[in-house]
Every structure is written in C-alpha cells, then in structure tokens.
Design a protein with these regions (language model features):
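DNA major-groove recognition helix of helix-turn-helix/homeodomain DNA-binding modules
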Residues: 79-94
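Short basic helix-loop element that most often maps to the first helix and adjoining turn
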Residues: 2-6, 10, 39-56, 83
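Charged, alpha-helix-enriched surfaces in structured cytosolic catalytic cores
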Residues: 36, 76-79
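N-terminal flexible/basic segments that precede or flank functional cores
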Residues: 1-40
Length: 99
C-alpha cells in the first residue's frame, strides 16, 4: 500500500511539473503575440497621427489603461484589442496555425 502511495505522489508531482512547464510556454507565447499585436496597433496609431486621448474618446478605454498596455505593463483582452483596432479602422484577426 505504501509503495502505491509513493508511486501515486511521484506521478502526481511529475504531472504538476509538466503542467507548469506547459502553462509557462503558453503564457510566453500569448505575451509575445500580444506584444506584437500591440506594437502593430501603436505603429498604426502613430501613422494616423492619433493620440491615446483620441483612441480613448472613441473606445471608452481610459488613457491610463491604454498607456499601460502600450508600454507592456498589462496584457489587454481581445475585446480591448478589437476596440483599439476598430478606432483605427482596422480589426483583429485570429488564426489557428500549426506549431
């Protein structure tokens, strides 16, 4: 019985480590993709000579929140990204790709 418990806890710890590694990988991917999208939106905002305040007025997103995610201090939701893109006459497109 004790051997089964040791095996159970050993397998449980291994699963938890695999899950933690997987979660970290996914979080890193999401952060990188979000950063790329935000950079594209900010570049487009500059190209259109729009200020954060103008984006805020159109979208209702507080300028402080815009500043936070433009600087990488916060990861915006997909809804916030779409609002921002829409204010620039653009939209967000999501694709499913192979690894």
């Amino acid at each position: 019985m004790q051997e089964n418990m040791k095996e159970y806890f050993s397998e449980k710890e291994a699963r938890e480590r695999r899950l933690a590694t997987y979660t970290e990988k996914i979080q890193e991917t999401v952060l990188n993709k979000s950063a790329e999208t935000i950079r594209s939106l900010v570049d487009e905002r500059y190209n259109q000579k729009m200020t954060q305040q103008e984006i805020s007025d159109i979208t209702g997103i507080k300028p402080s929140n815009l500043a936070r995610f433009e600087s990488g201090g916060r990861v915006p939701t997909l809804i916030v990204l779409e609002k921002y893109a829409n204010a620039l006459g653009k939209h967000i497109e999501i694709k499913i790709c192979d690894d």
